[in-house]
């Protein structure tokens, strides 16, 4: 797997959980001898939803809710087969979405 790169994008609503997962991935890749670039923080997405508080009229009474999606990017440069094996066996929390590109 010479001259290849693995790009890992992580998404989560909880930034502390996301940082812990990114740290696990970086440590695992470094122990197998691969070069690691990151974790790079990507822009946070904010989804804002506005709803009416009252059931009938009173359009001025509104409430806003938001959910933030935090993202991180990790590049693993020149991974070995041991690196790929270790990443496949890695156990990460359920609240983290992982997208891997080779």
Curated annotation (Swiss-Prot):
<dbReference type="InterPro" id="IPR001848">
    <property type="entry name" value="Ribosomal_uS10"/>
</dbReference>
<dbReference type="Pfam" id="PF00338">
    <property type="entry name" value="Ribosomal_S10"/>
</dbReference>
<dbReference type="GO" id="GO:0005840">
    <property type="term" value="C:ribosome"/>
</dbReference>
<protein>
    <recommendedName>
        <fullName>Small ribosomal subunit protein uS10</fullName>
    </recommendedName>
</protein>
<keyword id="KW-0689">Ribosomal protein</keyword>
<comment type="similarity">
    <text>Belongs to the universal ribosomal protein uS10 family.</text>
</comment>
<comment type="subunit">
    <text>Part of the 30S ribosomal subunit.</text>
</comment>
<dbReference type="GO" id="GO:1990904">
    <property type="term" value="C:ribonucleoprotein complex"/>
</dbReference>
<dbReference type="GO" id="GO:0003735">
    <property type="term" value="F:structural constituent of ribosome"/>
</dbReference>
<dbReference type="InterPro" id="IPR018268">
    <property type="entry name" value="Ribosomal_uS10_CS"/>
</dbReference>
<dbReference type="InterPro" id="IPR027486">
    <property type="entry name" value="Ribosomal_uS10_dom"/>
</dbReference>
<keyword id="KW-0687">Ribonucleoprotein</keyword>
<comment type="function">
    <text>Involved in the binding of tRNA to the ribosomes.</text>
</comment>
<dbReference type="InterPro" id="IPR036838">
    <property type="entry name" value="Ribosomal_uS10_dom_sf"/>
</dbReference>
<dbReference type="GO" id="GO:0006412">
    <property type="term" value="P:translation"/>
</dbReference>
<dbReference type="GO" id="GO:0000049">
    <property type="term" value="F:tRNA binding"/>
</dbReference>
């Amino acid at each position: 797997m010479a001259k290849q790169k693995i790009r890992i994008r992580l998404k989560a609503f909880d930034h502390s959980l996301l940082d812990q997962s990114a740290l696990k991935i970086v440590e695992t890749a470094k122990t197998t001898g691969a070069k690691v670039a990151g974790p790079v923080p990507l822009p946070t997405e904010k989804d804002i939803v506005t709803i009416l508080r009252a059931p009938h009229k009173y359009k001025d009474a509104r409430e806003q809710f938001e959910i933030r999606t935090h993202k991180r990017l990790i590049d693993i440069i020149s991974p070995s087969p041991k690196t790929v094996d270790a990443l496949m066996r890695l156990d990460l929390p359920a609240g983290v979405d992982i997208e891997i590109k080779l």
